Amino acid sequence: MSKIVKVVGREIMDSRGNPTVEADVYLESGHMGRAAAPSGASTGSREALELRDGDTSRYLGKGVETAVANINGAIAEALSGIDAINQEAVDNIMLRLDGTDNKEKLGANAILAVSLAVAKAAALSKGIELYEHIANLNNTSGKYSMPLPMMNILNGGEHADNNVDIQEFMIQPVGAESFKEGLRMGAEVFHALKKVLQKRGLSTAVGDEGGFAPNLASNEEALQVIVEAVENAGYKMGSDITLALDCAASEFYRDGKYELSGEGKSFTAEEFADYLAELCDRYPIISIEDGLDESDWDGWKVLTEKLGSKVQLVGDDLFVTNTRILKEGIDKSIANSILIKFNQIGSLTETLAAIAMAREAGYSAVISHRSGETEDATIADLAVGTAAGQIKTGSLCRSDRVAKYNQLLRIEGDLNGQAPYRGRQEVNAG
């Protein structure tokens, strides 16, 4: 009764007003799973290919009708009669059908939407929650945890139109006793930050991920206004709330130098590693994502040696959720954590493999959204079902971000104490 009988793809809109792919998968039992692919702004060069039409007469060339046609044609035909409960078989059929290293034939957006929709349909057919089904696929049945959220409350870089070079300034409610309490703490700091910015006469417009995007003089000023907001909200920096950065350094890496144009500064890799280390000395920053360019592996070695024993160093563009690249990083002792994004690799099976490889090597795994999102909240179930321990899904604003937080609240309530919230223990920071 869990055999696939119909697969339907369609073009829908994401949170930035761009088209994306959605898929419905119908089973013999009558159950239907639906999922949508997200899309990134700052993307790693080695990510799986997001197939766009390139027809400038539609959506400025960003249409996804070709990817949708691949779902309604070749993918639907190949998956007809396949058991949805066997996720690996389903994904492998699509990978073989595509036959390329980066999924350029069918599109990672097409394959991913179907892959996740299959998982949702399978969970429904079994009468269980999606996080339970994911745990079964991950061989971690019953071993749940609620993730520590990294809340992106101040945006710069590619996520905002301002002069702040670091892309994301995040808070982590490490002192909370539950996800529900952590979410409340984050929301209170978010509202306190709005008041701090208003008092300074700064913009309270928000960026792609719901964080504020004011024009500030420097990256350090961004940290200063967050510290003020945390204290105004009645919390203590370091014990209640810690900080995390996403530098997205590939976006300001030019000709071997790290160019902070907002501050008029230029650094070598070693100098920028020192710059980050100094920030960590002055502020309770316990996680830094993409601190250096994705291709600057020599620089990453320096950064890891300098900070890796006390700060979580997360590879996003560096590893692109790819086990082959992650293994190379592990072998070379580069970074100590991986950001997990479904659409960087393009299927649920490959995503679970990356999480498993990281865990086996002692690397943490941070489940993540993209800047272009939809109401799809699958990453919430992924975080709980794999007990990854951390999630990054934007600010406490915009329904495309809050949808994931609300799903986590529901899951925590459903599990009623069976999924512990471990706070700072989840962070690979010495």
UniProtKB/Swiss-Prot annotation:
Belongs to the enolase family. Catalyzes the reversible conversion of 2-phosphoglycerate (2-PG) into phosphoenolpyruvate (PEP). It is essential for the degradation of carbohydrates via glycolysis. Component of the RNA degradosome, a multiprotein complex involved in RNA processing and mRNA degradation. The active site is at 209 (proton donor), 341 (proton acceptor). It comes from the Bacteria. CDD domains: enolase (cd03313). The keyword Magnesium applies. It comes from Idiomarina loihiensis (strain ATCC BAA-735 / DSM 15497 / L2-TR). InterPro entries: Enolase (IPR000941), Enolase-like_C_sf (IPR036849), Enolase-like_N (IPR029017), Enolase_C (IPR020810), Enolase_CS (IPR020809), Enolase_N (IPR020811). Pfam families: Enolase_C, Enolase_N. This is Enolase.
